[in-house]
């Protein structure tokens, strides 16, 4: 009796392994993979185009900046100070003037 159970278990195991490998290439699996790829691309695109996302790590007003590589916020520009800070020789972020 024990031998028959082992043989049946081995046959069922072999059939499960061979049939299980064929299911990976099924139309449902490929459709699911394509949908996940499309969702990932759309989700990433929405994150890049979102106007509600904050600008990160930018120098605010009166923060030192580099003239060659300004890191001021979008509402500021990198200018040389005209008043009390001109002797430092560095540039600072100032609010953009409306023209």
UniProtKB/Swiss-Prot annotation:
Annotated Gene Ontology cellular component terms: extracellular region
Disulfide bonds: 58-73, 65-78, 72-93
InterPro entries: Toxin_22
Molecular function terms from GO: sodium channel inhibitor activity; toxin activity
Summary of the tissues where the protein is detected: Expressed by the venom gland.
Organism domain of life: Eukaryota
Keywords noted in UniProt: Cleavage on pair of basic residues, Disulfide bond, Knottin, Secreted, Signal, Toxin
Signal peptide from the UniProt entry: 1-22
Propeptide, residue positions: 23-57
Subcellular location: Secreted
Principal place of residence: secreted
Pfam families, A to Z: Toxin_22 (PF08092)
Function: Insecticidal neurotoxin.
Free-text domain note: The presence of a 'disulfide through disulfide knot' structurally defines this protein as a knottin.
Family, per entry: Belongs to the neurotoxin 14 (magi-1) family. 08 (Ltx-4) subfamily.
Name of the protein in question: U2-theraphotoxin-Lsp1a
Organism this protein belongs to: Lasiodora sp. (strain IBSP 8539)
């Amino acid at each position: 009796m024990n031998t028959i159970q082992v043989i049946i278990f081995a046959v069922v195991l072999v059939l499960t392994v061979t049939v299980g490998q064929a299911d990976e290439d099924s139309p449902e699996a490929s459709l699911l993979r394509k949908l996940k790829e499309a969702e990932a691309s759309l989700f990433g695109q929405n994150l890049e185009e979102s106007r509600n996302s904050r600008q990160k790590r930018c120098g605010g007003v009166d923060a030192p900046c580099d003239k060659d590589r300004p890191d001021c916020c979008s509402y500021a520009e990198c200018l040389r100070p005209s008043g009390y800070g001109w002797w430092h020789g560095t540039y600072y972020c100032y609010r953009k003037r409306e023209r």
